């Protein structure tokens, strides 16, 4: 292949990338119902609470929430774990 053909192919592929990036949001909007619903709520400022947060109990003016991330963090802190690894089970090879 000569240099001008390679340059032309490079230009074509770059433009294909631009067009793909421009069309991608339209494709998501048209074909993905979850994306359409979320986008519609975002545009109209109609926010809903997430389903993963559960109300555990109410005491006076305080509301306590429970979700998997906070429960795991509490468990790891209670049992002296980092990243799910108990410090007595794992010794770093760097330590002397």
From Swiss-Prot:
Membrane topology qualifier: Multi-pass membrane protein
Segments on the Extracellular face: 1-8
Cytoplasmic side of membrane: 31-96
Sequence motif: NPxxY motif, positions: 24-28
Annotated TM spans: 9-30
Location (main, coarse): membrane
Membrane listed as a keyword: yes
Keyword hit for Membrane: yes
Lipidated sites in chain (S-palmitoyl cysteine): 45
Keyword field: Behavior, Cell membrane, G-protein coupled receptor, Glycoprotein, Lipoprotein, Membrane, Palmitate, Receptor, Synapse, Synaptosome, Transducer, Transmembrane, Transmembrane helix
Residues the record marks as carrying a glycan: 2
Gene Ontology BP annotations: heart development; regulation of behavior; smooth muscle contraction; vasoconstriction
GO molecular function: G protein-coupled serotonin receptor activity
Gene Ontology, cellular component aspect: neuron projection; plasma membrane; synapse
Localization in the cell: Cell membrane; Synapse, Synaptosome
Subunit details: Interacts (via C-terminus) with MPDZ.
Function: G-protein coupled receptor for 5-hydroxytryptamine (serotonin). Also functions as a receptor for various ergot alkaloid derivatives and psychoactive substances. Ligand binding causes a conformation change that triggers signaling via guanine nucleotide-binding proteins (G proteins) and modulates the activity of downstream effectors.
Record text about domains: Ligands are bound in a hydrophobic pocket formed by the transmembrane helices.
Family: Belongs to the G-protein coupled receptor 1 family.
Identification of the protein by name: 5-hydroxytryptamine receptor 2B
